[in-house]
Amino acid sequence: MMAVITEARATARYVSVSPRKTRLVIDQVRGLQAEKALAVLKFLPNKPAEAVYKTIASAVANAEENLGLSRNDLVVSEIRADEGPRRQWRRFGARGRFKPITRKTSHITVVLTEKVS
């Protein structure tokens, strides 16, 4: 007998925001219903909020299209921001020196499950 899949995933990779700042945003929506999480993220002013919003919206669309689940029954069961590769380059400074610059990236993963009634 095959198990019924009731979880939808979405991943945003190489997002140009630091994982630390992204984790501050995702801690606010972990465990919420998907619709409520999207409403909360819509009004957050942080840059990572937009990337997290898009990833959760993508997971909701995956659940509706691929699994036929209702968006009202979905809960953010797992959400995480992992470190992506760092882009490094240098700016030239005074006296022949250079200043290294590092741009951090994140991989955002969202797992939605169906709410148990």
What residues fall within each predicted segment?
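Structured, basic alpha/beta domains of bacterial-type, RNA-associated proteins
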Residues: 2-17, 23-28, 32-117
